[in-house]
UniProtKB/Swiss-Prot annotation:
Stated family: Belongs to the V-ATPase E subunit family.
Name of the protein in its database record: V-type proton ATPase subunit E
GO CC, any one term: plasma membrane
Protein encoded by which gene: Vha26
UniProt entry tagged with the keyword Ion transport: yes
């Protein structure tokens, strides 16, 4: 039985409605899938950027902490250096004051002669030569001449060896020198300074740790007292 035009139109409309519905469902499915993929990608990108931001600020925070530690360490070191500078200046002041007082030793002739004798004998033990030239301040020549016999006897008594001492009356120690002697042997190739200043310098090197301890107390953090 042949379909009428109305039936044909009806079937066509039905087919078109079905196709349209299927197309709409497919479109909705595609949209839903696209939105899901978009949300997943968006979430991934957001998380990625969040991690980057967190990593950036963690790095910045560590840099700030490190900078704080460096600044704190620098400030602490500077403070320590300032304290050390003040202490060293004070120690130097004590030694400078001692140097200024050296000249007072020479004002007492008897005491100074005793000192000169000891300085000459000490120098002889260092130089250990049979012929020695003594150099002193011009003003001290008479005093040195007076103590030569006693110095020679003390030296001979210790090592049982004779020594000839000569006073250099051409070249003298500077008048600015506080006193003491300089010993020379072998045409000046051996020289032993034993002035009051040189003795103070030697003693001060040995006593600086003790001076520091006396002025500021012992540093419990140091194992050695150099």
């Amino acid at each position: 039985m042949a379909l009428s035009d109305a039936d044909v139109q009806k079937q066509i409309k039905h087919m078109m409605a079905f196709i349209e519905q299927e197309a709409n469902e497919k479109a909705e499915e595609i949209d839903a899938k696209a939105e899901e993929e978009f949300n997943i990608e968006k979430g991934r990108l957001v998380q990625q950027q969040r991690l980057k931001i967190m990593e950036y600020y963690e790095k910045k925070e560590k840099q700030v902490e490190l900078q704080k530690k460096i600044q704190s360490s620098n400030m602490l070191n500077q403070a320590r250096l300032k304290v050390l500078k003040v202490r060293e200046d004070h120690v130097s002041s004590v030694l400078d004051d001692a140097r200024k007082r050296l000249g007072e030793v020479t004002k007492n002739q008897s005491e100074y002669e005793t000192v000169l004798t000891k300085l000459i004998v000490q120098g002889l033990f260092q130089i250990m030569e049979p012929k020695v030239i003594l150099r002193c301040r011009e003003v001290d020549v008479p005093l040195v001449r007076n103590v030569l016999p006693a110095a020679v006897e003390q030296y001979k008594a210790q090592i049982n060896q004779n020594v000839e001492l000569f006073i250099d009356e051409k070249d003298f120690l500077s008048a600015d020198t506080c006193g003491g002697v300089e010993l020379l042997a072998l045409n000046g190739r051996i020289k032993v300074p034993n002035t009051l200043e040189s003795r103070l310098d030697l003693i001060s090197q040995q006593l600086v740790p003790e001076i520091r301890n006396a002025l500021f107390g012992r540093n419990v953090n140091r194992k050695f007292t150099d």
